[in-house]
Amino acid sequence: MTLRLFDTETRALRDFVPLAPGHASVYLCGATVQGDPHIGHVRSGVAFDVLRRWLLAHDYDVAFVRNVTDIEDKILNKAAEAGRPWWEWAATFERSFTWAYQQLGVLPPSVEPRATGHITQMVEMMQRLIDNGHAYAAGGDVYFDVRSYPRYGSLSGHKLDDVHQGESAGECKRDPRDFTLWKAEKPGEPSWPTPWGRGRPGWHLECSAMAEFYLGAAFDIHCGGLDLVFPHHENEIAQAKCAGDDFAQYWLHNGWVTMGGEKMSKSLGNVLSVPNVLKKVRPQELRYYLGSAHYRSMLEYSDTALDEGAAAFRRIESFVLRTQERAGEVPVGLWTEAFARALDDDLAVPAALAEVHGKVREGNIALDGGDLEGARGIASQVRAMLGILGVDPLDEHWTQETADASAATDALDVLVRAELERRQSARAEKNWAVADEVRDRLIRAGIEVTDTPNGPEWSLKAGQ
């Protein structure tokens, strides 16, 4: 079966036919690094990591670009409020996003360009737009003339009369529907030289210029969150087409993570940061949960839903680990036809997971019935399918994390045992003050101590 993808622009499932046979070029709108990532931010990374893995599994040479927006109004405002340099603020949270992606096992992109590193490409694209009659300079700003592009609105379905760019009208705009390509220099803000004066780039220009620079005038797939369809992606198309590029052939958009039916966002105050959620579940469990819904569907968050997702992953993991323990090494095998049909149908992960869980049930029956070779064969299939979804429990990414955690636990055990011996000695000497002080310090560190007939035992409190 041919891979079919839902293209936002045509509003239809389309067979994936790459521009160059055997090669796939993908651009994913990455983070605006204004603060710590929440699980809504990283859902797109997880969703389109599955697309990338599925293409790689079919021997495509995949060029995968994920940008970093490191200059933008929110970054400048938050850095100023905190009294920190804008570049330091951006770099700090870029590292936070990189850490989050790594924790969730998202493959690193082929390249991760920063907007500030591509001013030359942006200036060159603006010049082409002006030369082609699609942009104009006014008052130090540069604007895109929306009326000059007859197909404006083709991606989002917006009618020109209804367009609102979400930015100030601007005294120098010819039409309030025009959008900003370049912002004139303001006191205290970073700026770069251009033929039209110093300033900094508008949000939309960055991605068009970087996509063209790395993937060429035409490339296969452009991905991003549903909230980017308008105005960001609509404006990307307008810029690129009017600059002479064919641009993206397919447009894919993932749904939001919602809470109470509303999009998870910092402004609504319903943010769950990745570090905080990872206090509740392991990284592979969070990845399983974020990837368990169809990428185009909304994912309604609740603690119960997260726990159910984690439990579902542990059932799969338990089967694979039990099989390895009883039947020996479990190599990565081949996925099933049903799994392939599901992913070829617009990356239908829920149907793919239904196949995985069906195989796990079949494998557990074989394992419990003593058919070790049968269970081993099924576990090999399960590993192949989980690998595409990025949650194979025997993958080095997750086993290394487990090994690191085990080493950390061993080191902690040595330290805690030393404290417990000190507590035992104090109790034997009836020095209750010292014994209580040791106990209280361990409690503050998140360590619970239980006195047993065989001596004290310790454990980490839930969520530590």
Curated annotation (Swiss-Prot):
Group of enzyme by EC: ligase
Pfam families hit by this protein: DALR_2, tRNA-synt_1e
This enzyme's EC code(s): 6.1.1.16
SMART domains named among the record's database cross-references: DALR_2
Sequence motif 'HIGH' region, residues: 31-41
Keyword Cytoplasm on entry: yes
Cofactor note: Binds 1 zinc ion per subunit.
Compartments (UniProt record): Cytoplasm
Protein name stated in the entry: Cysteine--tRNA ligase
Organism: Rhodococcus jostii (strain RHA1)
Taxon lineage: Bacteria, Bacillati, Actinomycetota, Actinomycetes, Mycobacteriales
